[in-house]
Amino acid sequence: HEDCVVSKESLTVTDNRTGKNYEIPVADGTIRAMDLRQIKTSDDDFGLMTYDPAFMNTAACRSAITFIDGDKGILRYRGYPIEELADRASFLEVAYLLCEGELPTAAQLDKWTHDIMYHTYVHTNIIKFLEGFRYDAHPMGMLLGVAGALSTFYPDAKNVHDPANRYIQRVRLMAKLPTLAAFCFRHSRGLPYEFPRNDLDYIGNYVNMMFS
């Protein structure tokens, strides 16, 4: 009986070139592309491959973080509908959810917020690096450059197997990217940099750095 149930979770493919039948396992509405490799016209044939430009109907990975159904307008983070999060959670609460898998408790949110706001400043050499970009450089290109340069200031980030180290790198990115984005924007406008103000909340600080 169990074998019969398992066999139903499969796709039977007939290769009309050879007349052979193949049984391809189906899991969660998907088949593995490598399972098609067994379909050959001869022993020295490479095997069947899929051709799907732009991954229009190909799942590249399994995600426990995000579910998207664009046709139905569905977006979920960690199982929560995005509409619910937009109504009830702050930006940093959603960021914590994405990173840790659960919405934070009050104590966890306090620590998360404190840690991020503590790390909002960037090294002065990053500013010197930013000054090397032309006045008309696109802000996204500048942001890509200075964000990549952060790795040279934190060699400890290479220790990816240490959970505490992974946490502090997440905190640094969350803290410094708004600062870098604002600096890139102001550089492109020829404006002086507005440094972080940690008496403001996360979004307020970013808006202040951008437009003050």
Give each language-model segment a name.
Residues 1-3:
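N-terminal mitochondrial targeting presequence
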Residues 5-212:
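Hydrophobic alpha-helical bundle cores within soluble ligand-binding/oligomerization subdomains
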